[in-house]
């Protein structure tokens, strides 16, 4: 892990602190994180509790945990100034909505910035550690991404993470 990566351990610790403050079990935390869910598979208790030791976490699930905490992705990146200020805040959702990463928008921004800097995909992969050129170009297909890697892309682009999210039906 890079010293300036999104910290899954810090996220786990924040979830655990809120859980203890509210005297909740991990099962109750998972139920609250999943509170807006209608028919898709819920985020499992083990997905939340395993963040303490995992090197990588599923991106959309972590967004739901951040929403429950009322925190931004940037607030778990060391050294991010004003990480909880308005430009970084995640939206408020209604029942049946889920916040997802918009990996196609992430690809489009990445490709545009790559071209403006006259970088090849190989050169870009060298600048954003932990990625191969194929991993970066595969973002164009949409689909899932994970933490902490996605935040390396977001930081390289210099835009708030929320810029690359979308509200979908849950």
Regions found by a protein language model. Give the residues of each.
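A short, Lys/Arg-rich alpha-helix, primarily the initiator
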Residues: 1-32, 36, 83-118, 123, ...
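Conserved hydrophobic/aromatic packing and binding residues within compact polymer-binding modules
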Residues: 29-30, 45-51, 76, 124-125, ...
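Short C-terminal boundary/hinge segments that cap the last helix of small helical domains
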Residues: 63, 67-87, 158-170
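Residue-level detection of the helix-turn-helix DNA-binding "recognition helix"
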Residues: 34, 53, 81, 129, ...
């Amino acid at each position: 892990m890079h010293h300036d990566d999104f910290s899954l351990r810090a996220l786990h610790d924040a979830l655990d602190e809120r859980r203890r403050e509210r005297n909740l079990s991990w099962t109750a935390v998972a139920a609250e994180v999943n509170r807006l869910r209608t028919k898709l598979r819920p985020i499992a208790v083990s997905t939340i509790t395993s963040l303490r030791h995992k090197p990588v976490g599923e991106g959309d699930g972590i967004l739901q945990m951040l929403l429950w905490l009322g925190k931004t992705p940037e607030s778990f990146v060391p050294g991010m100034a004003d990480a909880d200020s308005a430009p970084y805040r995640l939206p408020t959702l209604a029942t049946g909505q889920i916040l997802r990463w918009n990996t196609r928008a992430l690809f489009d921004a990445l490709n545009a910035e790559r071209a403006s800097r006259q970088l090849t995909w190989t050169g870009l992969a060298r600048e954003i550690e932990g990625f191969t050129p194929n991993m970066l170009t595969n973002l164009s297909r949409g689909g899932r991404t994970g933490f902490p890697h996605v935040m390396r892309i977001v930081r390289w682009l210099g835009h708030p993470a929320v810029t690359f999210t979308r509200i979908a039906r849950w």
